[in-house]
Regions:
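Compositionally biased terminal segments of proteins
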Residues: 1-197
Length: 197
């Protein structure tokens, strides 16, 4: 996603935790089911890491994108650089709220219905948020296939006792194919961790 839209001026928008709560409340008020992913969800399953991004899985088809965008625009999220054609093609977009990226991922695959069903309610400040289940967070991170994602996956494999590896492998196979190198990397990581116990 393009980072060029980020404002370089002093960010006078609310702090990140307040933005997360505001996004949650705005989408809930618009009756748009959603769950947070990324580093925010990771913090509930493994060692937290710093982030300035807000990843939101929107459990609605991409044709409802205007409803989600309208809800966020009212908060002060910048949507002027949004490319509707790319959003409809890719099922995702990056917006900016001050210096924080807000990444929206819309539903287009059967896994997204499972994500919605298995999302977990967690405490966040004085409220409660919905986050992705750990298995679905691992699948998302494996699909992105960045170095930091594999570090996060390793931490989750170590710290999350009840992680359903069979479900992770099943969904990843459906989404990327049985011969994809990401499945090999996941298997190697599991073996390395098992050998170190």
């Amino acid at each position: 996603m393009n980072d060029s839209a980020m404002g370089s001026e002093l960010d006078e928008s609310p702090p990140l935790p307040d933005k997360v709560i505001a996004i949650h409340e705005a989408l809930a008020e618009a009756k748009i089911p959603h769950a947070f992913g990324g580093a925010l969800a990771l913090a509930y399953y493994a060692e937290p890491r710093a982030t300035i991004d807000i990843d939101v899985n929107v459990f609605a088809p991409v044709k409802r994108w205007r409803e989600a965008i309208d809800a966020l625009t009212q908060l002060g999220v910048a949507t002027g650089d949004l490319d509707p054609t790319a959003l409809e093609r890719d099922g995702q977009c990056r917006l900016w709220w001050g210096n924080n990226a807000v990444d929206l991922f819309f539903a287009y695959d059967p896994i997204h219905e499972e994500m919605k069903k298995q999302a977990r309610r967690v405490p966040f400040g004085d409220t409660t948020l919905t986050i992705l289940a750990p298995e679905h967070l691992v699948v998302c991170k494996a699909r992105f296939d960045r170095r930091k994602d594999w570090l996060d996956i390793e931490q989750m494999l170590i710290a999350t006792d009840d992680l359903n590896l069979e479900a992770i492998e099943g969904w990843l196979t459906k989404m990327v194919g049985a011969t994809d190198p990401r499945l090999t990397r996941l298997a190697e990581l599991k073996s390395e961790l098992a050998a170190s116990e």
